């Protein structure tokens, strides 16, 4: 019986480490995106530009990123809907299988 507990304990530990790894990878990816954003900003800003021109560039970049966020939110909603539809279909198939198996 103790080996079962050890297996469960190790599986939980493995899952926890997997979640931590995914979280850390997300943080690395997010920070790389920030670095890319700042590099892009440096490419656009020139020494002879006025403050208003710089602000206009930043506002334009902000609007572009907000549009991307909106696109990702919409895509997430579509994926979630597809997952719910699949789950519903699996439940229906399971119920049909139970009813068919019960009649045999």
Swiss-Prot record:
Its main location: cytoplasm. Pole-localizer protein involved in the regulation of several cellular processes. It holds the Pfam family DUF496. PANTHER family: UPF0265 PROTEIN YEEX. One of its GO terms (cellular component) is cytosol. It comes from the Bacteria. This is Pole-localizer protein TmaR. It is found in: Cytoplasm. InterPro entries: DUF496. The keyword Transmembrane helix does not apply. Keywords: Coiled coil, Cytoplasm. It comes from Vibrio parahaemolyticus serotype O3:K6 (strain RIMD 2210633). The gene is tmaR. The keyword Cytoplasm applies. Residues 7-34, 76-96 form a coiled coil.
